[in-house]
């Protein structure tokens, strides 16, 4: 079973929830709303601060969310959760990441890329960031960045339908390293090659990154076979840490 989480404190999440329940029939089952293999939970508070313990109940969960961008990037995104480095201003804990969901998160983004044919939105990964704390594999799906986008019918159908029908493929999973928040080179490599992506360590987290956090990213990317590294978008100290870790653990290192 899978779990979808929506928040009434998030206007985009509310619109995604409305689309979800209008298109797909959910009925109460065991105290939660259910449609096939999906349960649905609606919370009142902000999801990034809503820690949940669900071990043994679901194989993964996905949170429906708005995306905020100071640069007003209009986007449809999927990303893992947690915090690399010492800050946890948006939920979770410092230097703590959740278990990523490479097969399903990648399958969701793959479906979004396949189904969206417009030019208004960028369909992309985001690097690992923000809370909350979960104890099962999880990912976020987001619409950015203003009310106009949160109400866009094509944005709603692309994101929600892709959550319900991800294009899941049994490809090897990799940790992404480098690039900015949207990891553009990693996204393009993903688009053109047979891989799944788990955690992504943005260059913005590289200055304070500890070597053991690389180990954590691998161990919290199920089935991880190695790294896909944006060489120019990775700081020199992190390039060396990743190379050393890959060599010592017989992991693949793909440099792009």
Swiss-Prot record:
Regions that span the bilayer: none
Cofactor note: Binds 2 Zn(2+) ions per subunit.
Keyword annotations: Hydrolase, Metal-binding, Zinc
GO molecular function list: D-aminoacyl-tRNA deacylase activity; zinc ion binding
UniProt GO BP: D-amino acid catabolic process
EC number(s) from the headed UniProt entry: 3.1.1.96
InterPro entries given in the database record: Deacylase_DtdA_archaea, DtdA
S-S pairs: none
Domain of life from the UniProt record: Archaea
Catalytic activity: a D-aminoacyl-tRNA + H2O = a tRNA + a D-alpha-amino acid + H(+); glycyl-tRNA(Ala) + H2O = tRNA(Ala) + glycine + H(+)
Cofactor: Zn(2+)
Function: D-aminoacyl-tRNA deacylase with broad substrate specificity. By recycling D-aminoacyl-tRNA to D-amino acids and free tRNA molecules, this enzyme counteracts the toxicity associated with the formation of D-aminoacyl-tRNA entities in vivo.
PANTHER family named in the record: D-AMINOACYL-TRNA DEACYLASE (PTHR34667:SF1)
Family listed: Belongs to the DtdA deacylase family.
Record text on subunit structure and interactions: Monomer.
Name of protein: D-aminoacyl-tRNA deacylase
Provenance organism: Thermoplasma acidophilum (strain ATCC 25905 / DSM 1728 / JCM 9062 / NBRC 15155 / AMRC-C165)
């Amino acid at each position: 079973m899978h779990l979808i989480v929506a928040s009434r404190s998030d206007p985009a999440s509310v619109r995604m929830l409305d689309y979800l329940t209008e298109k797909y029939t959910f009925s109460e089952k065991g105290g939660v709303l259910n449609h096939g293999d999906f349960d649905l939970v609606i919370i009142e508070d902000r999801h990034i601060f809503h820690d949940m313990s669900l071990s043994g109940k679901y194989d993964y969960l996905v949170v429906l969310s708005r995306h905020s961008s100071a640069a007003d990037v209009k986007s449809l995104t999927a990303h893992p959760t947690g915090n690399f480095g010492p800050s946890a201003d948006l939920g979770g804990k410092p230097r703590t990441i959740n278990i990523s969901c490479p097969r399903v998160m990648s399958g969701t983004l793959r479906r979004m890329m396949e189904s969206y044919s417009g030019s208004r939105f960028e369909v992309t990964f985001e690097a690992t960031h923000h809370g909350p704390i979960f104890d099962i594999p999880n990912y976020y799906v987001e619409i950015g960045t203003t009310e106009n986008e949160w109400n866009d019918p094509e944005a709603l159908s692309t994101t929600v339908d892709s959550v319900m029908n991800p294009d899941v493929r049994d490809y090897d999973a990799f940790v992404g390293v480098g690039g900015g928040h949207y990891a553009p080179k990693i996204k393009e490599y993903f688009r053109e090659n047979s891989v799944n992506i788990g955690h992504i360590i943005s260059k913005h987290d590289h200055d304070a990154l500890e070597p053991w956090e690389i180990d954590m990213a691998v161990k919290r990317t199920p089935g991880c076979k190695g790294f896909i590294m944006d060489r120019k978008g990775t700081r020199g100290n992190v390039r060396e840490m990743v190379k050393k870790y890959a060599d010592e653990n017989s992991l693949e290192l793909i440099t792009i």
